[in-house]
Amino acid sequence: MASYQRLGALTTLWSPGRGESLAVVRIAFGAIGLLSAVRLVARGWVDTLLVAPAVHLRYPGLEWVPVPPERGIHLLVGVVAVSALGVMVGCWYRVAIVSFWFAFTWLELIEATVYLNHYWFMTLAGALMVFLPMASTWSVDARRH
């Protein structure tokens, strides 16, 4: 009987759950991404850390990632900000999280001297969030459907 009860406990892992915890993670993730983009612009770090250096220190093995021109870097920061806002409110979530991940990771990979360990976490978490149903609760997408 005890083994049957353990099996029953395992089947609850696959039962539908509530989406509020995923919504909280999505909102916090989007807010952190938006704040990181706003901080880059507000402190002038876009120009001093990403645009101005004549030589960019690259990550070993990732030298093939192109460094965009000045307008391209500013555009990437804008994409990070707008897509982070989209992730936060759950508006066109899949498009927002993919564009956030792409732009954020690109900015991270073009300059190794701007390394922050939580940025690597944002990259890994963003990659996972592409495949999770994070916009099923407390989002514009959920209200639309």
Name the predicted role of every residue range.
Residues M1-H145:
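Alpha-helical membrane-anchoring segments
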